[in-house]
Structure formats: structure tokens, C-alpha cells
């Protein structure tokens, strides 16, 4: 059931403990060890992948956080999900072309651009809305090159007739927070360096309408979208961002935001543990780090640097009440923009990505597109 107003419903299921940033992929199964030719072979989360784990101390696991990451004593990092990639293509797929462009040579970071194929036939001056997208994955997994994000943005670009730029950023644990926020702001600056039509990337120069720029992201990317909109306001970014879409944002804190928020201490501590041990181990505030505890950090939202915000929440998502509390705080902040809240009562975290054939996925896509085109 779809609701556009906040309401009470049952507490998110404790079974979400291992799915709080991203639902477990359908292919995921707990790692198991089998003996082959006298060696241990550990089956990873992707069933088609096998990796030999030799019996010596360097292969000792010192930290494991399914379904995200495994850390070995010798310093190796093994991601347990979100590692599959698909290539960009200049051959139209679903009437959309794509390509990868490096925006940060120092960190070897790229953006993936998506453009309606028909736009390449348009005369100069026919500009398109510009969508800047930040992927989810708990600041640990996924990338703009993941199939779920490539496919999602292909559909968005086709439906909205826009230019999309999907941003790669450094991920934990190799690069803890705030690296992701530094990179995404650098990407925004790089994109806006094209606003006069003289940047280094031709598609942005030719097709991006900088009077119609939108930020968007899901999960960790939803959190990043908020912080980027806030920084855009603080830095007085010009032209001003038109809107921000915040989908199932990964926002947390040591304590519940209300009586309907997750009360189970095991779940609360489990979410906090991923943040404190993997994502931001240097934070002195733990789960109350202002990057993570957006609602309870005492930050002032009145300087949000865009004109409108769409907040999407899911009733079976562990971040459900945090998302609603975020929207409520934004409405009361004195910010002059418009806030719309959409609640899918019977859906889980990022259902539109993980189950695009679900009953509510088409309506989600319709609202997402209308926010950009409306």
C-alpha cells in the first residue's frame, strides 16, 4: 500500500538484521568450507565464484560482516556482494547509450554517463535535465558499474529523457568515511565545471541543462545525497540544484528516533557495528557520528541547497522511521523548499533495485521520473 503521509505500522522484522543496508542478494548464501585436494576452498556469496584459502596464517579471517566484507590478517579485503560489473556501451541498449569518464585521476575514480540515444540526433541547444546519482551499498559495496545501478539508470534516462551521471567514490574499509563525501563533492564540482559549456566532457557540455540539476541516491547514496545538498547550500553552488531524491536513506543513531523505530538492541548494535568497525572506525561518536546520525546530530537543515526534496521510505526497511523523522525535521527546519514523502508500507529496503518486477516497482519509477520531469 502506498501512503503519502506518515503513519504507524508494525516494527521492521528482526530478520532484517543482516539486510539493513541492502537486502541479501538472491544468490547469497553463508560462506561454507569444503575440502578439495587437501586444501580448503571457501565458497563466496556469488555461487559461481570459488577461492582457494590455503592453510597459513595470512589467510586468517580477523573480521567478517556478511553480506558486505571479510578482512584477512594479511590485510586482504574480500567483498561478499556487489562486485559484479557490466560495461558501458555506445551501442543503444533500451534506447540509451553509456560511457565511463575519469573525473579524479588521483584516486582513479570515474563517472558513468547515460544519454538517450535520440538526443545525439538533436540540434545543439536542446538541453536535458541532469541527474547526478550516488549508489548505495553501505559505503562498502556496489559501484556505478553494478548491474542493478546500470539497469536502473538506463530505465530512468529512457523514461525521463535526461542525462544521468552515476558517481564512483572511494569505499570502506580501504578508505573510510569521509572519503566518500569528499569524492562525491569533487564529482559535483567536476560536473559543474561544464556549466558554461567548456568542460572536458562533451556529453555534459552539449546536453546538460544546469537549470535542471537533480541529486539522487539510495541507502548510503541517499545519505550522501542529503549531505551533498547541504554542502551545495553552504558553498552557494551555482546554478542552484533544482531537487534531491533521497531513497531509503541509511540514517541511524545509538537511540531510536521514536517508539516505532527499531528497539531491538541486537539490531541497533549490529547496524552500529558496521559503521564503527568498517565504515568509519576513526569516528569518536560511533553511530552518533553526524555523517550517520543525520536526524539527531543537531544539524540545521535550513540551508539545504535545492528547491525541492522527495523522500522515499519503505515500511519493512530498518531505516523506515529514520527516513520519516528526516523528512519531518526538514519540514520544520525553516527551509523554504518543498518536501514530499512517499511511503511504501509493504516493501523492504531498495526493493525497486533488488526486485524490479515487484508490484510497486513501476509506481516507484513513475514517481522518481515525475520528480525530474515535473
UniProtKB/Swiss-Prot annotation:
Chief location of this protein within or outside the cell: mitochondrion
An example Gene Ontology CC term for this record: mitochondrion
Active site: 219, 317, 349
Subcellular localization: Mitochondrion
Targeting presequence: 1-52
Record-level Gene Ontology MF annotations: carboxylesterase activity
Family matches, as Pfam families: Abhydrolase_3
Tissue expression profile of the protein: Expressed in leaves, stems, flowers and siliques.
Cystine pairs: none
Position of sequence motif Involved in the stabilization of the negatively charged intermediate by the formation of the oxyanion hole: 135-137
Keywords: Hydrolase, Mitochondrion, Serine esterase, Transit peptide
Function: Carboxylesterase acting on esters with varying acyl chain length.
PANTHER family per the UniProt record, alphabetical: ARYLACETAMIDE DEACETYLASE (PTHR23024), CARBOXYLESTERASE 4, MITOCHONDRIAL-RELATED (PTHR23024:SF507)
Name assigned to this protein: Probable carboxylesterase 4, mitochondrial
Gene (UniProt): CXE4
Amino acid at each position: 500500500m502506498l501512503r503519502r503521509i506518515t503513519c504507524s505500522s508494525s516494527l521492521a522484522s528482526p530478520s532484517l538484521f543482516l539486510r539493513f543496508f541492502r537486502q541479501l542478494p538472491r544468490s547469497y548464501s553463508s560462506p561454507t568450507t569444503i575440502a578439495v585436494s587437501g586444501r580448503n576452498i571457501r565458497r563466496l556469496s556469488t555461487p559461481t565464484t570459488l577461492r582457494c584459502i590455503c592453510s597459513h596464517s595470512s589467510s586468517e579471517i580477523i573480521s567478517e560482516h556478511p553480506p558486505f566484507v571479510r578482512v584477512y590478517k594479511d590485510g586482504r579485503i574480500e567483498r561478499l556482494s556487489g562486485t559484479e560489473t557490466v560495461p558501458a556501451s555506445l551501442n543503444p541498449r533500451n534506447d540509451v547509450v553509456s560511457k565511463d569518464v575519469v573525473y579524479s585521476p588521483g584516486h582513479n575514480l570515474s563517472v558513468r554517463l547515460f544519454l538517450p540515444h535520440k538526443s545525439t540526433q538533436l540540434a545543439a541547444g536542446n538541453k536535458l535535465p541532469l541527474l547526478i546519482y550516488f549508489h548505495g551499498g553501505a559505503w562498502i559495496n556496489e559501484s556505478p558499474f553494478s548491474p542493478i545501478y546500470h539497469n536502473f539508470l538506463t530505465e530512468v534516462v529512457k523514461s525521463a529523457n535526461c542525462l544521468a551521471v552515476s558517481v564512483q567514490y572511494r569505499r570502506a574499509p580501504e578508505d573510510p568515511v569521509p572519503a566518500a563525501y569528499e569524492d562525491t563533492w569533487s564529482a559535483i564540482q567536476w560536473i559543474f565545471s561544464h556549466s558554461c559549456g567548456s568542460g572536458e566532457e562533451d556529453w555534459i557540455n552539449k546536453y546538460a541543462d544546469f537549470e535542471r540539476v537533480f541529486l539522487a541516491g539510495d541507502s548510503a547514496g541517499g545519505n550522501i545525497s542529503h549531505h551533498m545538498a547541504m554542502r551545495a547550500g553552504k558553498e552557494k553552488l551555482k546554478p542552484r540544484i533544482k531537487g534531491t531524491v533521497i531513497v531509503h536513506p541509511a540514517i541511524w543513531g545509538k537511540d531510536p528516533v521514536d517508539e516505532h523505530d527499531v528497539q531491538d538492541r541486537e539490531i541497533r548494535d549490529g547496524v552500529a557495528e558496521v559503521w564503527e568497525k568498517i565504515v568509519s572506525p576513526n569516528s569518536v561518536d560511533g553511530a552518533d557520528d553526524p555523517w550517520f546520525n543525520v536526524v539527531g546530530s543537531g544539524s540545521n537543515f535550513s540551508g539545504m541547497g535545492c528547491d525541492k526534496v522527495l523522500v522515499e521510505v519503505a515500511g519493512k526497511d530498518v531505516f523506515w522511521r529514520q527516513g520519516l523523522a528526516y523528512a519531518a525535521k526538514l519540514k520544520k527546519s525553516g527551509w523554504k523548499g518543498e518536501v514530499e514523502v512517499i511511503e511504501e508500507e509493504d516493501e523492504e529496503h531498495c526493493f525497486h533495485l533488488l526486485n524490479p518486477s515487484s508490484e510497486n516497482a513501476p509506481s516507484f519509477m513513475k514517481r522518481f521520473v515525475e520528480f525530474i520531469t515535473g
